[in-house]
Amino acid sequence: MTDYILNGVLGLAVGDALGQPAQGKTRESLKFSPVLEMRQGLWSDDTSLTLCTLASLRENDWRLDYHDLLRRFAKWLEYGYLTPEGVAFDIGATTKQALLNYLNGVPLECCAPRNEWNCGNGSLMRILPVEFYLQAQPAAGRYEIIRNVSALTHAHICCTLGCFLYCAVAGEIIQHRERFKLATL
């Protein structure tokens, strides 16, 4: 499992680092103004929040602690925890709203916005370590766990379903399934 964790998180971080300079730009704009240089060692919130999730699981003996997750996300926002330069940047509006709610004492289960205007990829980008946790858990209850982790910042059902499907595919890869059918997910 250690190889899957390392490979998964490194793959995510490399993809994040390579994609970050082009984030928010159209293909058309990149034709005229391509990314020609990249700063070394820079990653975005995608990697930082994934590392927060992984650190929480590892430091809690692979147990999920939703309060600890939100504390680490808030520490990232406020203090640049697990960032390459000690400063959080590139934070999505929905994630920021949920974390500010948490910092202002809103109960954990009420921090994230639930409307369709808050459907971003903020929970999807950090959910992979949860699949590593789920590998040692019974299949029943997978969706509820994934939903709970997603809903810390992104509570709309579209976000939680996206996370569930992503984890299902990652789980199939971890289980060495060469071909899998959507029906088995």
Predicted regions and their residues:
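Structured, active/binding-site neighborhoods that engage oxygen-rich ligands
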Residues: 1-185
